[in-house]
Amino acid sequence: MSAVVLAAVISTLTLEGDLTPEGGDYLVVPFEVPAGTVEILFHHQHDTPGTTLDFGIEDPGGFRGWGGRLGEDTVIGEQESSRCYLTGPIEPGTWRIDIGKAFLSADRVHWTATLEFRDAATVEPRPRADFEARVLEPGPRWYRGDFHVHSHESGDASASFEAIRDLARARGLDFVNLSDHNTVSQQALVAAFQSSIDDLLFLRGSEVTTYGGHGTSVGNDVYIEHHIGRDGVTIEDTLDAAAAAGAIFIINHPELDLGDGDACIGCAWSYGDAGIDRVSGIELATGSYDYVPVFGRQVLAMWDEMLDAGAHVTGTGGSDDHDAPIEPPASGDSQIGTPCTVVWADELSEAAIIEGVRRGRVVVKLRGPDDPMVELTATGEDGSTAMIGDTVRASQVALTARVEGGAGMTLVLWRNGAEDESVVVEGDHFAHEFVRTTAAGGDRYRLQLAEAFDVVITNHIWVEPGAQPPDDGGCGCSSGGGRGGLWWILLALVWLNRPRHRACTSSGHDALHHPHHRAGRRPDPVPLRTSGSVGDQ
């Protein structure tokens, strides 16, 4: 931001104090803004090496910005503000410094804040625009993206919008969600940036970064409350705020516990099942593939516990990229698109991508967009069909797995959170059928494709019990006589001898990918170990 004019300083205020572990995670310090103020310069520091403090500002109306551990001087103004902070009127009256005790390395930490009140703007405004709901591409298909990307509007990140765009394009992504820490300062800026881009969709969002867990909100243009424990705020309140803003909420890196210290403060999810009915998603993988062997199985177990409890939570992925490096990063670092979240959506728009996640129509590629594509479809006795995320009612179901590009890998069918059956993928165009009888309480099925560790994970198809044949000791006959038993025998014969056609040829590709759950019949499942063409386009 370049200088515009020299401003006169109306007044300067210095505040200081001590922080201890007692008294909660946050300290709020009020201060008065004099009339005539157009811009505020904010500087803060503390005296204890190894300590991490977070800082934000609240105006009389509430949230004004959250720089977190950002140590640089901050400008908050009517015409322009520093990164992480909102631009707008400087209302005279009582404002507040918001201090978060992220990590205290001593029993007492001394902090100092200096505020300078100016009568004129000193920085050039950046282009801003209101959000415009855009459709960048019509039509349903699998769209590839990343729900967890930080821009320079996060206090601990450096990536410009241009760098994010260039890297996302290079990796073949269709969308990215800007999940900047506890702020929406990026929203108007990226709306202006989006106006000249037609091949990459930027989603509105933020990372709600608390000291007990992080989560991405997708679809909000207002700040989501993150001060858990302050003024009685609970995680349920935060989830309610996200829902009220029209956003979905995805739990980020839920098992990323790096122990004591400030390596990743509050990264692991510690809120248990509180408010889980308001959670739309959970990151199955975050950042570098190097983390999959360390945290992968723990996250899957947590996900299955949620599903066992009845929550239809969608598995997603997110890079947590902070720098947008165009070259592949060193081991352990993240890059946009690793992992890649592939969403079946009716079009490339924010609303359609969000709806795809709500419906569970998601496949996660843990290494990136070039990983194999895995799909799962289900067909019931009556011809009703389901794709990933759907529910089908059937007493017996045919599950068809299709893999593109995974020759030599192992494909595992998971049923209700347990490994059910595995097959070796024989070729780069592979299909396999599993036939299962539905349990009395229903079933859920997903696929995991692996080498040494998981490479691709699908979301679930849900199967509810259909009309069951009468209990006659296994003969299939009705105990009351009549034609009931014969009917079920004939139905079984029709089922076992139904015509099968190769549905995954290149000419039938579009038909394969359009969901018609309970609204018509898809092509019949392909025979075991047949070849064809399938992919995420």
Annotated model-derived regions:
Residues 485-501:
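A cross-kingdom C-terminal cell-surface attachment/processing module
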Residues 51-53, 105-117:
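Edge beta-strands of jelly-roll/beta-sandwich modules across compartments, strongly enriched
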Residues 475-487:
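Juxtamembrane/start-of-transmembrane alpha-helix segments at the extracytoplasmic/lumenal side
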